[in-house]
A protein has these predicted regions:
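Charge-dense, helix-prone N-terminal extensions
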Residues: 1-109
Length: 109
């Protein structure tokens, strides 16, 4: 697993400090899920969000952005398929979201 950032290098621990406490457990679970999808995962910690890519080709498949009480998620399965955008407030549809993220990881080239 590689960690990459453009511009000022930002670590997840620094980023975690800006995530509202109410959102942290859900964000952490989604982050861990993405990191465990494969050895070729690249985590790009940006100013307000984290983007997960498949290998150094930077084919991103998931974008997680915390808000005050939710997580904005963008999922990309292919450059030819429109991006799916979701807002998650609780664990209610977590398994469904994980399935979509895994499908995106599997299908992105």
């Amino acid at each position: 697993m590689d960690f990459v950032s453009f511009g000022n290098k930002k670590e997840f621990n620094d980023f975690k400090n800006q995530i509202p406490i109410i959102v942290q457990p859900l964000f952490e679970e989604l982050r861990q899920f993405c990191l465990e999808l494969g050895e070729n995962i690249v985590e790009d910690v940006r100013m307000h969000r984290i983007v997960f890519c498949k290998s150094m080709t930077f084919r991103w498949f998931t974008d997680l952005e915390p808000t005050q009480n939710s997580i904005l998620i963008k999922i990309q399965k292919s450059r030819k398929i429109p991006i799916t955008s979701l807002e998650v407030f609780s664990y209610d549809k977590l398994e469904e979201i994980k399935t979509s993220i895994k499908d995106a990881y599997t299908s992105i080239h």
